[in-house]
Amino acid sequence: MNDIIKVTNVSKAYGGVKANVDISFKVKKGSITGLIGPNGCGKTTLFNSIVGYHPIDGGSIEFDGKEISHLRVGDIARLGMLRTFQQTKIYTKMNCVDNMQISVSHRRNSKNGIFASRKGEIRERAEDLLEFVGLYSKRNLISGDLSFGQQKLLEFAMALMNEPKVLLLDEPTAGINPTLINGLIDRLGRANQELGITLCVIEHNMRVIMNLASHIYCLS
């Protein structure tokens, strides 16, 4: 497998605080890669650097063979790399289907991009993906009324609407009750195997990451 993400000697500091120092790692195309380490070691900062939320101070970041460290979030998203967050970023006053439909913004010209111009097809895809993550029965509910775990599943489905090549997930099981964790593990695995999405996952739950990832990096 080729490397779809290649991080080389990346450093990032906030004033006098060094969040990342000479970090290097690779993510193989089609893999699930884990990123572990204690709180405060710079995992989330590294994710933010990769997707363009802030400039890096040194090093390089390549995505699918292209240097992206100079690009902004929207440009990187349009190339096919998205991320989710520890705290969900959903529209809590809207129902689940509307959340899904409004999320279609980054990759209008994807291989299945024709659906993006057809409202009925967008809704059909939204409902299919809600079924994929186990939220079809909740599709018309206001998303703010969902449990936190269900909101994380919704955010995951919203990312899938944009057909990413790579999805970075920041602690996807944090705050989720144990009964939902197994279902989330299953759906992440299916997204990788059935949809061909490369996953890079920050996770503190070692059972989860050992079950999911084929490669694991540790930041100290």
Feature-to-residue mapping (PLM):
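Conserved ABC transporter NBD signature motif
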Residues: 59-66, 79
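Conserved ABC ATPase "signature" region
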Residues: 113-138, 179, 186-189, 198
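Catalytic Walker B motif of ABC-type/P-loop ATPase nucleotide-binding domains
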Residues: 167-171
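Conserved catalytic motifs of ABC-family nucleotide-binding domains
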Residues: 163
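Helix-to-loop junction immediately C-terminal to a conserved catalytic motif
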Residues: 51
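The feature captures the beta-strand-to-loop junction immediately N-terminal to the Walker
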Residues: 36-38
